[in-house]
Regions:
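N-terminal "leader" segments that precede or initiate the main folded domain
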Residues: 1-94, 181-189, 204-245, 392-428
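Membrane-embedded catalytic interface detector for glycan/lipid assembly enzymes
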Residues: 78-219, 230-248, 418-428
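Hydrophobic alpha-helical segments
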Residues: 326-428
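Small-residue-enriched transmembrane helix-hairpin modules in multi-pass membrane proteins
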Residues: 137-145, 235-354
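Hydrophobic, membrane-inserted alpha-helices
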Residues: 11-15, 160-164, 183-190, 206-211, ...
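Hydrophobic alpha-helical transmembrane segments
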Residues: 2-19, 50-60, 98-104, 111-118, 152-162, 173-177, 335, ...
């Protein structure tokens, strides 16, 4: 094991141990982002696959620029909020459970959301004539299950699941309504599994986890590791559904990934490669890139909503996945920034993200509301998958954010004032 891996795993262990301090916030920006990236780099530097290569100095520098810029943003937010009284998490839980909701509005918003999802599902199915789960192993792909406009609305499951949890949390009684909402939400979620999509479900899970952590006593530090492993297992399970011969899957991955360890541990191949190849692809690509795309990827939602994405891509012959040496085709969030704007984008955009996310965190801790917790929960998801993709650029992500914003704005009763509770809490 290299000194880089030892250092990164040591940072991960330190973050975990600090989470057991009293009033320590396990979801603070520095902890979430630091843990995810320390783990990713530590695993990548083990070089357990022959597809991995020794990173160039340029690759290391550019990767660390992105990480350091984000952490610099969080540090500035910390300095700006020094001395500011933060509501302890125990007091936050009391305040958040006291929020008032217009029950009928939230109920019907969820029902309408399920209706929109159902109509979109049926329209695309009738247009295509197949479901992704039933065409695995063929030339058809899950990304082909799409009709312009309806393809975005099909991703409503994230806000449907979250708002159903909010309904259960804030609405007292109403057992029949809760059973009905839970039933239609589970049906929608079950049908969504057939599409072999994962990010929308992971988004719902992480935002729900954040809400339950800050608003209830259900989530404790000792449970977080099991939840993290559960989420990772879900990623792996969705990946396995794309193949017919599951009994040969582990050995297939082991062979194609050219792993260096014994075949007895072949089942570890896909989780490991899923985590590290994003960084490998980024480091390999940045040293070969000789042109930039000036916002095409960072602001992907703009070209998507206007219908220009395919036209612009074809006109300029943009290769969305260049310089690959394997079937793993993602590059981490930093790739979008570098490919669009070079080193300047890699320094500036993560800095703005780190600063913005951290300022949102301190706003949530000083003025705890369901809206603020929800907004920060979405950003926890962004940090959690930053080693993989940059979800903010996706149209489906912005659609879910708008749905959450308008749903909560319409259903929650506004509070006129908030009382600062308790002493200054642990900030990082």
């Amino acid at each position: 094991m290299s000194w880089v891996s030892l250092l990164c795993f040591g940072i991960c262990l330190g973050i975990v141990l600090f989470c057991f301090r009293r009033e320590a916030d396990i979801l603070s920006p520095g902890r979430v982002f630091g843990f995810v990236w320390s783990l990713a780099i530590g695993l990548a530097d083990l070089k357990l696959s022959r597809l991995q290569q020794t990173w160039s100095l340029e690759g290391w520098v550019l990767l660390l620029i992105g990480i350091s810029s984000f952490l610099a943003g969080t540090s500035i937010a910390y300095v700006l909020n020094l001395g500011k009284k933060l509501v302890p998490i125990s007091a936050m839980r009391r305040l958040l459970r006291q929020e008032e909701v217009v029950e009928r509005r939230l109920f019907w918003f969820i029902v309408v959301g399920v209706g929109i999802y159902t109509v979109s599902y049926l329209v695309i199915f009738l247009a295509k004539g197949w479901l992704p789960v039933f065409v695995v192993g063929t030339r058809l792909s899950r990304v082909d299950f799409y009709v312009f406009g309806f393809g975005v609305l099909l991703n409503s499951t994230a806000f449907i699941v979250f708002l159903t949890v909010v309904y259960h949390l804030l609405v007292h009684g109403r057992r029949a309504e809760k059973i009905f909402l839970t039933s239609i939400t589970l049906i929608a979620l079950g049908s969504y599994f057939l599409l072999l999509q994962r990010f929308q479900i992971i988004m719902a899970a992480i935002v729900c986890f954040t809400l339950l952590y800050y608003a209830t006593s259900y989530i404790k530090p000792r449970n977080v590791l099991f939840i993290f492993l559960g989420v990772s297992a879900f990623f792996y399970w969705i990946s396995t559904l794309r193949y017919r011969h599951l009994e040969l899957l582990s050995m297939y991955f082991y062979s194609t990934a050219k792993m260096k360890f014994s075949a007895a541990y072949a089942f570890l191949t896909e989780p490991y490669m899923y985590m590290v190849m994003n960084l490998e692809n980024f480091v390999r690509a940045v040293s070969r890139l000789d042109h930039h795309t000036y916002g095409y990827f960072t602001f992907d939602f703009l070209v998507s909503v206007t219908g220009l994405e395919k036209w612009v891509g074809q006109y300029f012959a943009i290769d969305r996945m260049p310089y690959l040496n394997s079937g793993y085709n993602t590059y981490s969030a930093f790739w979008d920034f570098y490919r669009d704007f070079g080193a300047a984008g890699l320094a500036l955009i993560p800095f703005v993200l780190g600063l913005g996310i951290s300022l949102l965190y301190y706003r949530m801790r000083s003025t705890p509301t369901i809206k603020n917790v929800t907004a920060y929960g979405v950003m926890v998801f962004v940090m959690f998958v930053s080693f993989f993709v940059f979800p903010i650029s996706f149209l489906w992500f912005l659609y879910n954010m708008l749905a959450l914003y308008w749903g909560l704005r319409w259903a929650l009763r506004p509070r006129n004032s908030y009382v600062q509770v308790g002493p200054i809490a642990e900030q990082h």
